[in-house]
């Protein structure tokens, strides 16, 4: 075989090898560009922040809301309890906002088909207000929610929201949620209105948790 023929044969072999490598790379690298849902991702997940002095978990209002939502939909509904102190230091609400925002972003990445529902009661409502209304890091809030992650949130249900005393100002400032947000305030509740009935603040179950579940069920 002549030298020219050998060179031509080697060149053709190199081209075939490169083509095979590129094809393999396309198969390996191409598919992960589209997020894949991990096994076990629920159809819907409620991310809920409990009220002041409630023990860790969803809290009374959050638990009743999740139960009511499950009763109003045939979809698989999971839940996540926002991890934060829920104590008398209201500045710690930013801890909850960081945790809630981080979890929403995690779910958007790992369970892209799951519809997320944000919720909170009393101080927990303030936690979710921060997540939905604060587009930049400030005052201890380190993990603002990117707009693409916000798109995964189907609805927001807030109970006894402290910002209600200011006309739900935080909700009005929310750039990415608009009509997805339902703020519920019992008449006379001193936390979310100018009322003076403490029992009103403690009476969101079952009437208003059922109302919120009906609102959310229509969004998911």
Where are these regions (language model features)?
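Phosphate-binding glycine-rich loops and adjacent basic patches that engage nucleotide phosphates
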Residues: 32, 60-69, 171-181
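Intrinsically disordered, low-complexity
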Residues: 35, 39-40, 45, 143-144
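Active-site catalytic motif of lipid deacylating hydrolases and related acyltransferases
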Residues: 40-115, 186-209, 213-218
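Serine-dependent carboxylesterase/thioesterase catalytic core
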Residues: 98-178, 182, 191
């Amino acid at each position: 075989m002549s030298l020219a023929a050998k060179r031509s044969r080697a060149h053709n072999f190199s081209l075939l090898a490169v083509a095979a490598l590129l094809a393999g790379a396309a198969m390996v690298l191409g598919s992960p560009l589209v997020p894949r849902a991990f096994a076990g991702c629920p159809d819907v997940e409620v991310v809920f922040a409990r009220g002041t002095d409630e023990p860790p978990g969803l809290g009374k209002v959050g638990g009743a809301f999740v139960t009511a939502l499950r009763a109003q939909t045939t979809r698989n509904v999971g839940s996540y309890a926002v991890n934060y102190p829920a104590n008398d230091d209201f500045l710690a609400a930013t801890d909850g906002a960081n945790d809630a925002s981080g979890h929403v972003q995690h779910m958007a990445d790992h369970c892209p088909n799951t519809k997320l529902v944000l919720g909170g009661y009393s101080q927990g409502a303030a936690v979710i207000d921060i997540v939905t209304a604060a587009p930049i890091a400030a005052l201890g809030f380190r993990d603002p929610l990117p707009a693409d992650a916000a798109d995964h949130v189907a609805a927001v249900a807030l109970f006894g929201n402290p910002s209600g005393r200011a006309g739900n100002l935080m909700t009005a400032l929310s750039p990415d949620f608009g009509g997805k947000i339902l703020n519920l305030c019992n008449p006379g509740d001193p936390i979310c209105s100018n009322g003076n009935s403490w029992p009103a603040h403690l009476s969101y179950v079952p009437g208003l948790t059922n109302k919120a579940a009906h609102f959310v069920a229509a969004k998911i």
